[in-house]
Amino acid sequence: MVKRPRVPTLPPKEALILELLLQEKEMYGLQLVAASRKRLKRGTVYVTLGRMEEKGYILSRLEPAPPDAGGLPRRVYEATPFGRRALAAWTHMARQLVPELAR
């Protein structure tokens, strides 16, 4: 069972990942690194994704490798409704703390 905090905590990297997933619906790890313009590093993105999945912010599934690419299946990530709410709460809080963000 996923443990869900009463007040979601959302470190900046997790907020960035949720923003990217909401823009694209679903992505795999290396797509997130590329879309973040290197703000996410290959070495930490999968640790962060695992932590986010434990918190219930995202879900993942294995997707078969494309036939032309060969290789291993890829893990694809998508935001959950709980993750969307956590991001909305985080964004609201950030705008309260820094009014310039509301513009």
State what each model feature region is.
Residues 45-55:
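Basic amphipathic alpha-helical segments that dock to polyanions
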Residues 1-2, 82-103:
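Amphipathic alpha-helical dimerization/coiled-coil segments
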Residues 7-46:
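N-terminal helix-turn-helix DNA-binding core of bacterial DNA-binding proteins
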